[in-house]
Amino acid sequence: MWFYLVTLVGLYYLLRWYRERQVVSHLHDKYVFITGCDSGFGNLLARQLDRRGMRVLAACLTEKGAEELKSKTSDRLETVILDVTNTDSISAATQWVKEHVGDKGLWGLVNNAGVFQAFAYIEWCRPEDCMSIFQVNLIGLAQVTLSMLFLVKKARGRIVNVSSVLGRVALFGGFYSCSKYGVEAFSDVLRREIRDFGVKVSIIEPGSFKTRMTDAELIIEKTKKTWEATPEHIRESYGQQFFDDFCNTTRRELKKCSTNLSLVTDCMEHALTSKYPRTRYSAGWDARLFFIPLSYLPTSLVDCLLAISRRKPAQAV
């Protein structure tokens, strides 16, 4: 019995390995639009796909970021300035992409742009903190997708949305996780709605990686500013010792971030170039061995595990 079961499992993974190694043809003719290319995952992916001969259309937030990227790539790569929170900027970028791709359509749309602000409890945050992070991580992503979807449908291409393991497991830390849960839901709905048009949607769920967005000292500085702006009665309920311990733990965990960004960009590249891309890609050992398994446990058990891993607030009952 066990022999047959192990054999079936082995055959399944062998078949999946074979399917996933099959690559789409004529990659050098395919256009890919990537947001958030100033640094981090987007920057590395743009260079990675350019080396592979694909037609990369890289969106950067700043002129400086665009110029630095152009200096490291071939003449095939084109850049455009894009602010995903600005509808006029999105419309202009869409028209620019349309002019470049012509009748071929857009093979790949990679929604990579994102922000990670203060790592703070929700009660410490202001309503505008919620809006600013949702505006980039979720609303901007949705607006870019809706604006360029007709071009992707024309090519029967791919949409790759960058989420996070915090879109699978809600840990302490405010609205970032909330925005990534939104990305997961948006991507699932979109995938099911447009599959009949030949468009495939993949979600990238990175673990902890060292980018500008996860700079420990910058995040701690923002967290302290958020704490200082929190009403006194809320700060008293948590206590200064709780906050200091929270900052120390955050700093310690952020400094463990992996520097191997290619673990993420390789997943993105596979989603764009494989004939049979996955629905979800978990990137990083912490994602695969901790966060994703944690997401399958009963919610009550996860709550208990997280509760015993942190200091209790000063006025906890």
Curated annotation (Swiss-Prot):
The active site is at Y176 (proton acceptor). Glycans are attached at N161. Keywords: Endoplasmic reticulum, Glycoprotein, Lipid metabolism, Membrane, Microsome, NAD, Oxidoreductase, Signal, Steroid metabolism. NAD(+) binds at residues 33-57. Substrate binds at S164. PROSITE patterns: ADH_SHORT (PS00061). One of its GO terms (molecular function) is androsterone dehydrogenase [NAD(P)+] activity. Its main location: membrane. SUPFAM superfamilies: NAD(P)-binding Rossmann-fold domains. It is a peripheral membrane protein. It is found in: Microsome membrane; Endoplasmic reticulum membrane. InterPro entries: NAD(P)-bd_dom_sf (IPR036291), Sc_DH/Rdtase_CS (IPR020904), SDR_fam (IPR002347). Competitively inhibited by 9-cis-retinoic acid and 13-cis-retinoic acid. GO terms for cellular component: endoplasmic reticulum membrane; intracellular membrane-bounded organelle. The keyword Ribosomal protein does not apply. GO terms for biological process: androgen metabolic process; brexanolone catabolic process; retinol metabolic process; steroid metabolic process. Induction: Up-regulated by testosterone. Levels are very low in castrated male rats. Residues 1-17 form the signal peptide. Its EC number is 1.1.1.105, 1.1.1.209, 1.1.1.239, 1.1.1.53. The keyword Endoplasmic reticulum applies. It catalyses: all-trans-retinol--[retinol-binding protein] + NAD(+) = all-trans-retinal--[retinol-binding protein] + NADH + H(+); all-trans-retinol + NAD(+) = all-trans-retinal + NADH + H(+); androsterone + NAD(+) = 5alpha-androstan-3,17-dione + NADH + H(+); testosterone + NAD(+) = androst-4-ene-3,17-dione + NADH + H(+). Detected in prostate, liver and kidney. Belongs to the short-chain dehydrogenases/reductases (SDR) family. NAD-dependent oxidoreductase with broad substrate specificity that shows both oxidative and reductive activity (in vitro). Has retinol dehydrogenase activity towards all-trans-retinol (in vitro). Has 17-beta-hydroxysteroid dehydrogenase activity towards various steroids (in vitro). Converts 5-alpha-androstan-3-alpha,17-beta-diol to androsterone and estradiol to estrone (in vitro). Has 3-alpha-hydroxysteroid dehydrogenase activity towards androsterone (in vitro). This is 17-beta-hydroxysteroid dehydrogenase type 6. It comes from Rattus norvegicus (Rat).
